[in-house]
């Protein structure tokens, strides 16, 4: 195979791989329609209460609002499991010495990294499927 043939083959592979990603569009088609939908799940309901000032949470010294959040979402603190994967918004903070703690119940996951002010949440919304949230404890 000559240099020109290899360049044409390479160019064909590159052009084919640059086709528009359609994965994002599927969230805007029925039945999901994310941008037109309003979440109705335990986290969105808790978010509404927080915005209205209906919750009086006192942060703890080392974990911030984690315990209050778990109690409000009815997640047992004993559900904790540790995860070392860096597939997180906080991947740069996660290490063998600082794993991400995951707390969960049947519908909700809460991710916490020691020393971070960000909590990651995922909930199974009945109408929208998996919905992801982040909770910045600095703003509370």
Question: Residues of each region from the PLM?
Answer:
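Bacterial N-terminal signal peptides
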Residues: 9-17
């Amino acid at each position: 195979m000559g240099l020109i043939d290899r360049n044409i083959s390479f160019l064909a592979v590159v052009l084919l791989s640059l086709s528009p990603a359609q994965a994002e569009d599927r969230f805007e088609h029925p039945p999901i329609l994310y941008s037109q939908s309003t979440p109705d799940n335990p986290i969105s309901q808790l978010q509404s209460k927080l915005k209205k000032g209906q919750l009086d949470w006192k942060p703890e010294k080392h974990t911030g609002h984690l315990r209050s959040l778990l109690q409000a979402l009815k997640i047992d603190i004993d559900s904790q499991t540790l995860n070392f994967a860096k597939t997180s918004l906080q991947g740069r903070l996660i290490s063998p010495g600082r794993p991400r703690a995951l707390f969960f119940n049947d519908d909700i996951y809460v991710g916490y990294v020691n020393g971070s002010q960000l909590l990651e949440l995922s909930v199974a919304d009945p109408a929208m499927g998996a919905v992801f949230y982040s909770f910045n404890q600095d703003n509370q």
